[in-house]
Amino acid sequence: MSQKPAKEGPRLSKNQKYSEHFSIHCCPPFTFLNSKKEIVDRKYSICKSGCFYQKKEEDWICCACQKTRTSRRAKSPQRPKQQPAAPPAVVRAPAKPRSPPRSERQPRSPPRSERQPRSPPRSERQPRSPPRSERQPRPRPEVRPPPAKQRPPQKSKQQPRSSPLRGPGASRGGSPVKASRFW
């Protein structure tokens, strides 16, 4: 465990250094924005925020200072740079179509809650057939599966009974009379 923090330690320190550079003053290798809102890499420059470096170009604004300024109150030349942040709002729009599937899930959950009360009043279904018929459209998919499970065994019972009546030709797909003709 002690080895992991030792490895992550220097990485964190580098990140801290970068964050300090961004928050406190400009760093040589980082990008700067000029008055034309163009992002350019400048090794030595001073931005409007008062960062210190060799070249005195007040037109250049480093991205770090821009980020700090934007949180406070961005200047007019910096505000257009924020507008590209509007696309995330557009990205949120597709998230809205995702909500309708959730609305579909909600109707499904109430039928589940209805299943429990149905089991005790099954004996009452006969006298209350009219109100039950109104509720049946929803539980139809739920009611159909159990009878379907009961039907297959009935069919299996019928098949062995019918097979001796049909004879050996039935397995071939034809009647025993047709089978005798082929022979």
Curated annotation (Swiss-Prot):
- UniProt lists compositionally biased (Basic and acidic residues) regions at 101-143
Compositionally biased spans, kind Basic residues? 69-78
Q: In this chain, where does the modification Phosphoserine occur?
A: S99, S109
Q: Which domain of life is it from?
A: Eukaryota
Localization per Swiss-Prot or TrEMBL: Cytoplasm, Perinuclear region
List this protein's GO terms for biological process.
nervous system development
Q: What is its main location?
A: cytoplasm
Q: Where are the sequence repeats?
A: 97-106, 107-116, 117-126, 127-136
Query: Which terms does the record give in the GO molecular function aspect?
Result: structural constituent of myelin sheath
InterPro entries reported in the protein's UniProt record: FYVE_2, Intracell_Transport_Effector
Is-annotated flag, keyword Repeat? Answer: yes
Q: What is the name listed in the Swiss-Prot or TrEMBL entry for this protein?
A: Myelin-associated oligodendrocyte basic protein
Source organism = Homo sapiens (Human)
- Source organism lineage? Eukaryota, Metazoa, Chordata, Craniata, Vertebrata
Gene assigned in the entry: MOBP
